[in-house]
From Swiss-Prot:
Disulfide bonds: 124-359
Note: Reaction proceeds by a ping-pong mechanism involving intermediate methylation of a conserved cysteine residue.
Family: Belongs to the radical SAM superfamily. RlmN family.
Pfam families with a match to the protein in the record: Radical_SAM (PF04055), RlmN_N (PF21016)
Gene: rlmN
Top-rank lineage group of the source organism: Bacteria
Primary site of residence: cytoplasm
Protein name per Swiss-Prot or TrEMBL: Probable dual-specificity RNA methyltransferase RlmN
Top-tier EC class: transferase
Catalytic activity: adenosine(2503) in 23S rRNA + 2 reduced [2Fe-2S]-[ferredoxin] + 2 S-adenosyl-L-methionine = 2-methyladenosine(2503) in 23S rRNA + 5'-deoxyadenosine + L-methionine + 2 oxidized [2Fe-2S]-[ferredoxin] + S-adenosyl-L-homocysteine; adenosine(37) in tRNA + 2 reduced [2Fe-2S]-[ferredoxin] + 2 S-adenosyl-L-methionine = 2-methyladenosine(37) in tRNA + 5'-deoxyadenosine + L-methionine + 2 oxidized [2Fe-2S]-[ferredoxin] + S-adenosyl-L-homocysteine
Database matches in PANTHER family: 23S RRNA METHYLTRANSFERASE, RADICAL SAM CORE DOMAIN-CONTAINING PROTEIN
Length: 373
């Protein structure tokens, strides 16, 4: 962790200089052309930033001193600072679930999570500080919306997780990314798209195929339409939680009213048809709320009209939020009804509940210290 003096200096620089990690390779190439530098320099610098995770231009020893000085006068490098590192090993999980509380240069706090699985290591990234959507089962919504994250603040989370792995001597590599952390990715679409472009750039030791990156949304219809024609190869997950409009409004009041199911369904069908990829419908089972066979039948009616798969997930307990998870018998009965209808269904196990790292639990623990200098 950097010293307070370093943090203060970095924050001051960030006020006047652009964070170079906010730039995609193409954007950096354009900026360097203005500095009369060849295009290949951009790839060289990006490799320092995202393969070697350099935190200063002085570390970029393959660049001339003159260029390093010019870069230092033009750009800043402002990685997030790790405020807290929690880990938890649970049940059949093949390794520890780890959560980092990160401080951004302006003092905003976010969380990112590393989730192990059989043959994979998934990074759960945040796209916003806080969230404006106020979903009733989600801790992040209780924070309110602070601001969108920049592309560099998004990729910086992956860098922080990779640095954590390297510091512990592990040779593991992040294999998958899910935008299921704090915030709504499709209310920060351009920055998320730029971050995906950087994270998936071939040739970096940390690069990840876009096919292994999932963007999760509450169902922002115009942005899903953009994603369908963007040419990106990412996967799409939609937080559904009920196929009854009125019930969905009670769970997700802002998103469900603004983007009703009868308008969302055809857009998801268009996405699936245009991309050839299934939409993942995420359905959190809540005891006595959305767990009946009638709920299952309504979900079948909604999901049978387009190429999709369904992830059933358990509710993860959150302080002051009065929902309960369903028992295994209820969950299995619900799943079996979907399977009988010919739908593809997966029961997703959540890990990291004891450290508040599971779905819906991210609330930037330590947010009360976000004004610390």
């Amino acid at each position: 962790m950097r010293s307070p003096q370093t943090s203060e200096k970095t924050h001051t620089m960030a006020k006047t200089l652009q964070n170079i990690t906010d730039l995609t390779l193409q954007q950096l190439t354009g900026r360097l052309a203005e500095m009369k530098e060849p295009a290949w320099r951009a790839k060289q610098i990006h490799e320092w930033l995202f393969s070697h995770r350099a935190e200063s231009f002085e570390e970029m020893t393959t660049l001339s001193k003159a260029l390093r000085k010019a870069l230092e006068e033009t750009f800043a490098i402002t990685p997030p600072e790790v405020e807290q590192h929690d880990n938890s090993t649970e049940g059949a999980c093949p390794g520890p679930t780890e959560k980092l509380l990160l401080r951004l240069p302006d003092g905003a706090m976010i969380e990112t999570v590393l989730i192990p699985g059989p043959g994979r290591l998934t990074a759960c990234l945040s796209s916003q500080a806080g969230c404006a959507l106020q979903c009733s089962f989600c801790a992040t919504g209780s924070l309110g919306f602070k601001r969108n994250l920049t592309p560099g603040e998004i990729t910086g989370q992956a860098n922080a997780l990779n640095s954590m792995l390297a510091a512990s001597g592990r040779e593991q590599k992040i294999t998958n990314i899910v935008f299921m952390g704090m915030g709504e990715p499709l209310l920060n679409t351009l920055n998320v798209f730029d971050a995906v472009e950087t994270l998936s750039t071939r040739g970096y030791t940390s690069s990840i195929s876009q096919r292994k990156i999932t963007i999760s949304t509450v169902g922002i219809i115009p942005e899903i339409a953009k994603l369908a024609t963007s040419g990106m190869k990412t996967k799409l997950a939609v937080s559904l939680h009920s196929a009854f409009q009125e019930k969905r409004e009670s769970l997700m009041p802002l998103a469900a009213r603004r983007y009703p199911l009868d308008e969302l369904q055809p857009v998801l069908a268009h996405y699936a048809k245009n991309t050839g990829e299934p939409v993942t419908l995420v359905y959190m089972l809540l005891e006595g709320v959305n767990d009946t066979l009638e709920d299952a039948r309504q979900l079948i009616r909604f999901a049978s009209r387009f190429f999709c798969k369904i992830n059933l997930i358990d509710y993860n307990s959150i302080v002051n939020i009065p929902f309960q998870s369903v028992c295994s018998e209820t969950r299995d009965r619900f799943r079996d009804r979907l399977l009988e209808a010919g739908l593809q269904v997966t029961l997703r196990k959540s890990y990291g509940t004891s450290i508040h790292a599971a779905c819906g639990q991210l609330a930037a623990k330590g947010m009360e210290h976000s004004n610390k200098s």
